[in-house]
Amino acid sequence: MQYARRLFKLVGWILLLIVLPLGLGYQVSLYFVPTPQIAVIRIEGDIWGSYTAYVSQALEEAGNDPAVRAVVLEVVSPGGEVSASEGLYFDVLNLREKKPVIVSINEMAASGAYYVACAADQIYAKPGSMVGNIGVISILPSDDLVDE
């Protein structure tokens, strides 16, 4: 009986002095030690002024975040304004100096969107994706012009 009581106390002290601090340290590390992450930034629709500012900010935040180890750009865009596309192109080039940048083309990356994608380290496209030339202009005629 005395032996069992001593053994129980010894096991209790071992748990209290060794296992409990290790468990607490692990739990605390989950909150304070950053885990490696991959940022996913979507470029959807037309590339133009205020939308470009949003994407530029996301690229800058990903570049400055030490937990982010790489960036994936998901592109579904027919392109857009020349100056806006060029701005994003240079933002991606700047980000590429800090971290790997991968582009995933879903459905379409034409004109300015393809220009932005060319700044990445690697480009992946689905087999059915439409990938167009830089500088392509796509205009649908309005109904008024068709009637003439």
Description of each model-found segment:
Residues 1-99, 108-148:
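Small-residue-centered hinge/linker elements
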